[in-house]
Amino acid sequence: MASDHQTQAGKPQSLNPKIIIFEQENFQGHSHELNGPCPNLKETGVEKAGSVLVQAGPWVGYEQANCKGEQFVFEKGEYPRWDSWTSSRRTDSLSSLRPIKVDSQEHKIILYENPNFTGKKMEIIDDDVPSFHAHGYQEKVSSVRVQSGTWVGYQYPGYRGLQYLLEKGDYKDSSDFGAPHPQVQSVRRIRDMQWHQRGAFHPSN
């Protein structure tokens, strides 16, 4: 796991995180509300996640229990079917969840071609990048240093494919952030609306 994921002193986390899991699609059937980490969804009485409603987030879900397997980032909003939270469409399994800490208004990430922060690199500050190739970076991504903010990387351009949550800290190898291959081709910031409630956040039209 990456190091230094603690929230900075004095920086607020998500205020009262809240997510509701429904067994059926379109928010039907038995449901269960979560306000904190859930290592095994089945232990809450929910056999299968058919739809998800995030009332306060963000959250990260995992394919397997105990936060293992493919990752799914949930931000505030409605997810009526499993394919609305996965862009890889590889699995409809959602077995564990935890709130994501958002501890900074600033966002800075450095992506490296080789493990241990070597080789060609690309630095991104306060921006979302839908295609690394369009920015002239065509190398693999084998290690990552997140200096501030919380990010999600994607296997393919356009925020598609497998998702990788990148919290503040160092990831010496792609396996440290859960990637089966050193392939990340787009990245975006995760921004907690509650953090920006004083007007620092301006959604783009």
Curated annotation (Swiss-Prot):
Chain positions covered by the region annotation Connecting peptide: 102-106
Q: Which residues form the Beta/gamma crystallin 'Greek key' domain?
A: 17-56, 57-101, 107-148, 149-191
Quote the annotated effect of residue 149 to V. Answer: In CTRCT3; uncertain significance
What the entry lists under SMART domains is as follows: XTALbg (SM00247)
One BP annotation, GO: visual perception
N-terminal arm: region residues: 2-16
Q: Where is this region: C-terminal arm?
A: 193-205
Q: Which domain of life is it from?
A: Eukaryota
* N-acetylalanine modified-residue sites: 2
An example Gene Ontology molecular-function term: structural molecule activity
Q: Which UniProt keywords apply?
A: Acetylation, Cataract, Disease variant, Eye lens protein, Repeat, Sensory transduction, Vision
Subunit field text:
Homo/heterodimer, or complexes of higher-order. The structure of beta-crystallin oligomers seems to be stabilized through interactions between the N-terminal arms.
Q: What is known of its domains?
A: Has a two-domain beta-structure, folded into four very similar Greek key motifs.
Protein family membership: Belongs to the beta/gamma-crystallin family.
Annotated function: Crystallins are the dominant structural components of the vertebrate eye lens.
User: Associated disorder, per UniProt?
Assistant: Cataract 3, multiple types: An opacification of the crystalline lens of the eye that frequently results in visual impairment or blindness. Opacities vary in morphology, are often confined to a portion of the lens, and may be static or progressive. CTRCT3 includes congenital cerulean and sutural cataract with punctate and cerulean opacities, among others. Cerulean cataract is characterized by peripheral bluish and white opacifications organized in concentric layers with occasional central lesions arranged radially.
Q: What is this protein called?
A: Beta-crystallin B2
Q: Which organism is it from?
A: Homo sapiens
